[in-house]
Design a protein with these regions (language model features):
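Phosphate-binding chemistry for phosphorylated carbohydrates and sugar-nucleotides
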Residues: 1-193
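Gly/Pro-rich interdomain helix-loop hinge
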Residues: 189-206
Length: 206
C-alpha cells in the first residue's frame, strides 16, 4: 500500500541513495536535508538524539506523513519519529522489528534461532517483550563490535540491536547494521497493515 514518510539524512552520505531505494520500493518520500554538505548546517547526523529529530518531527506534521525516518552520517544507524512528530526511543523501535522477526520463525525453532541480543542501555520493557513473543533475550555489553562478535558466535540468531540505533538484521540479511535496509524492513512491516485511514494502527500505537 501507499506509505508517505519524511526522510532526514542530516546532509550526510546516505541521502541520495536512501531516497532512490525507498522510492524504488514505492514509498512516497519527502526528503529533508538529504543533499550532501559535510558542514552539516542543519543538525548533526545523529538520529538517536531527540534534538536532531525536531525538524523531522515538524516535517512529518506538515506533510501528514505516517512517520519520519532519520539516518546517521555513515548509514548504519536508524531513528524514527511517529505521526505526531514524537521521538521513538531505539529500544522501542527494536521491539517492532523483534515482533516481525520472531513471528517468522518456525514452531520448532531452536533456542539460538530465538535468541535476540540487545545492549545494556535498553529498557527492561524490551527484554520482557522478547520473552512474551517467544524469544530468548540476551544482554550484551554496549558497542557494535560486541554485537557483531555475538552474531559470529551465534550465527542462527535472527537479530541484535543497540540503544545507539544500530540494528543488525540476521534473518534475511547478513547481520550488518544498514540503515537503508532497516528502513526498508520497517516500511515492509508497516505496510502489512491497512493505513490508519482504513483502520490500521498509527505508528504511535505500535
Amino acid at each position: 500500500r501507499d506509505i508517505r514518510v519524511v526522510l532526514d539524512c542530516g546532509n550526510a552520505v546516505p541521502g541520495p541513495l536512501a531516497i532512490k531505494v525507498l522510492e524504488r520500493l514505492g514509498v512516497d518520500v519527502i526528503p529533508l536535508y538529504c543533499d550532501w554538505d559535510n558542514s552539516f548546517p542543519n543538525h548533526p547526523p545523529d538520529p538517536t538524539r531527540q534534538e536532531n529529530m525536531e525538524d523531522l518531527g515538524r516535517a512529518v506534521l506538515e506533510h501528514g506523513a505516517e512517520f519520519g525516518i532519520g539516518m546517521d552520517g555513515d548509514g548504519d544507524r536508524l531513528g524514527v519519529v511517529d505521526e505526531n512528530g514524537k521521538f521513538i526511543h531505539p529500544d522501542r523501535l527494536m521491539g517492532i522489528f523483534v515482533e516481525e522477526v520472531l513471528s517468522d520463525l518456525p514452531e520448532n525453532a531452536t533456542e539460538e534461532q530465538r535468541t535476540i541480543f540487545f545492549d545494556v542501555k535498553c529498557s527492561m520493557a524490551l527484554e520482557e517483550a522478547i520473552e512474551e513473543l517467544g524469544g530468548v533475550p540476551k544482554m550484551v555489553r554496549t558497542g557494535h563490535t560486541f554485537m557483531k562478535k555475538e552474531l559470529r558466535e551465534f550465527p542462527d540468531s535472527p537479530m541484535a540491536g543497540e540503544m545507539s540505533g544500530h540494528f543488525f538484521m540476521n534473518d534475511h540479511w547478513d547481520g550488518f547494521d544498514d540503515s537503508i535496509y532497516c528502513a526498508a524492513r520497517l516500511l515492509s512491516i508497516i505496510g502489512m497493515d491497512p493505513s490508519p485511514e482504513q483502520g490500521g494502527p498509527k505508528f504511535s500505537e505500535r
